[in-house]
């Protein structure tokens, strides 16, 4: 593995948005930014052996803010569509943001993709990012603590792992 690199990719609400790039000796690359724990690049070879980025995304940070397609972003607390933008849990009804016809798609505009994560740890082959969500954010219950880790193997395979704790059912 080569040494990781860090760069400022943008600024969000007065804070630097950092991007971390990891590269194998064989040429595979993975780049992740702290805004939305978003994958910016994954460079891998095609069947002819030519390396190229296969992640759909944007060249500038500003295009990621309010990014409805959520290109490369970590999606949560719910990935997918919640019909009618409402759900019941433990006898209580929760109303969510409507952002797709009458539904809530990918947790709405306040999902993890809109959070600025903090760097917990970084090494030459990966990192762990962290953020918190307060009870009621986006209409969802529970105070959440969220860790997302990315790890690039020398073979080019990468792994994403999530750990979330909460103080109530969600």
Please tell me what each predicted stretch does.
Residues 1-170:
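Surface-exposed acidic/polar loop and edge beta-strand patches at domain peripheries
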């Amino acid at each position: 593995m080569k040494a990781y690199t860090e760069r400022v990719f943008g600024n969000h609400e007065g804070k630097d948005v950092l991007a971390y790039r990891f590269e194998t000796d064989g040429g595979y690359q993975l780049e992740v930014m702290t805004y939305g724990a978003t994958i910016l690049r994954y460079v891998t070879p095609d069947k002819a052996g030519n390396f190229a980025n296969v992640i759909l995304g944007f060249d500038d940070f500003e295009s990621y803010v309010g990014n409805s397609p959520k290109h490369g972003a970590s999606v949560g607390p719910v990935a997918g569509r919640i019909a009618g933008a409402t759900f019941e849990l433990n006898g209580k009804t929760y109303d969510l943001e409507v952002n797709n016809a009458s539904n809530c798609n990918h947790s709405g505009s306040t999902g993890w993709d809109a959070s600025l994560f903090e760097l917990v740890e970084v090494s030459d082959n990966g990192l762990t990012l962290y953020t918190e969500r307060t009870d009621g954010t986006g209409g969802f219950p529970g105070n959440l603590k969220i860790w997302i880790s990315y790890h690039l193997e020398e073979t080019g395979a990468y792994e994403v792992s999530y750990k979330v704790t909460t103080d109530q059912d969600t």
